[in-house]
Regions:
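C-terminal active-site/capping subdomain that shapes the small-molecule cofactor and substrate pocket
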Residues: 2, 226, 238, 242-326
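Generic structural signal for residues in well-ordered beta-strands
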Residues: 71-73, 224, 305
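Short clusters of hydrophobic/aromatic residues that line enzyme substrate/ligand-binding pockets
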Residues: 64, 129, 144, 185, ...
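Short alpha-helical
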Residues: 99, 124, 208, 249, ...
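Hydrophobic alpha-helical scaffolding
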Residues: 148-149, 202-204, 281, 309
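Active-site-lining helix/loop region of Rossmann-like oxidoreductase modules
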Residues: 3, 7, 11-18, 27, ...
Length: 326
């Protein structure tokens, strides 16, 4: 049985805890975060998005007990000092966001873990592997991998499929729920807009999606522009693509392309729908992207494509998929 530890118990780390605690093929042996254990137990039990934990959960000295299983709870800020060797940890899920370079992530390896799976796009010297796209490129010798982020996992499949027709340019706006890297009330921030009240404003932010997509799809280098617009909701996202193709197409052709992909080689990764969804409807959806066929529009060779995704639940599903490959 694979032995797992989670470093960083923010939104992604806590959701992974909830989803892995009863996994029959994985043993969650430890979590690490600088927050106090009783506070961690509280946040694991009561979640403002996904509701109350379905089972028993309580804090013990140095541990969290969930559904009768005891998970060691550590508070070590230096990953090199974590007891991964003693705990025989196979894979560390690095969810803190603070150790995404190879040098930083290798601290977990030096501490005794066999492998590290980031929860974000890592530095350029870490393989960027998107599940459902290039997961077969993973080698047994690779100890640190990056699965991209939620936006990369949504966008990669869409652009790859459309590039079968031929893409001349892509403009992408990710309408995304606010995150912990924004302020709830106006406050100082090195990125001024992120310092504005997240629940009261529509806030454009810069993202590195373009760079990630160009790493994965080098044929599109210089053809992609992206931005994220943070909106006053706590969960969910909608990717808005404006794509110029090499040739004219139709709404029917584009929708058929994605409906076919969702039913076949991308089953479980892409979902296609013609239901009149809103962001609340995709909470808990496990797909990397949900193509909304009702919102597809085409003018000549210009395509407007809309895809929903649960930025937390969909992405943690892909991280769990990766554990099956490691």
């Amino acid at each position: 049985m694979m032995r797992i530890a989670i470093n960083g118990m923010g939104r992604i780390g806590r959701l992974l805890f909830r989803r892995l605690i009863d996994n029959k093929e994985i043993e969650l042996v430890a979590v690490n975060d600088i927050m106090e254990g009783d506070n961690l137990a509280y946040l694991l039990k009561y979640d403002s998005i996904y509701g109350t934990f379905a089972g028993t959960l309580a804090h013990q000295p140095g541990a969290i007990e969930a559904n009768g299983k005891v998970v060691k709870a550590l508070q070590q800020p230096n990953p090199a000092l974590l007891p991964w060797k003693d705990l025989q940890v196979d894979v560390v899920l690095e969810c803190s966001g603070s150790f995404s370079s190879r040098e930083a992530a290798e601290q977990h390896i030096k501490a005794g873990a066999k492998k590290v799976l980031l929860s974000t796009t890592g530095s350029a010297d870490i393989p960027l592997l998107v599940y459902g796209f290039n997961q077969h490129a993973l080698t047994k010798d690779e100890t640190i991998i990056s699965p991209g982020g939620c936006m990369t996992n949504c966008s990669t499949h869409i652009l790859y499929i459309l590039n079968a027709i031929g893409i001349k340019s892509v403009q992408c706006n990710i309408l995304h729920s606010y995150t912990s890297r924004q302020e709830l009330v106006d406050a100082p921030h090195k990125h001024f807009r992120r310092g504005r009240a997240a629940a009261e404003a529509i806030i454009p932010v810069e993202i590195d999606l373009q760079q990630s997509l160009e790493r994965l799809l080098p044929v599109l280098k210089g053809k992609i522009a992206s931005v994220s617009t943070r909106v006053p909701v706590a969960n969910g996202a909608m990717a808005d693509f404006t794509i110029q193709l090499e040739e004219d197409t139709t709404r029917q052709e584009i929708n058929k392309l994605f409906a076919t992909a969702a039913a076949n080689e991308y089953k479980g990764i892409i979902e296609y729908t013609e239901d009149p969804l809103v962001s609340l409807d995709i909470k808990g959806n496990t797909h990397s992207c949900i193509i909304d066929g009702t919102l597809t529009s085409v003018v000549g060779n210009h395509v407007k494509l809309i895809a929903w995704f649960d930025n937390e639940y969909g992405f943690t599903t892909r991280m769990i998929d990766w554990l099956g490959k490691m």
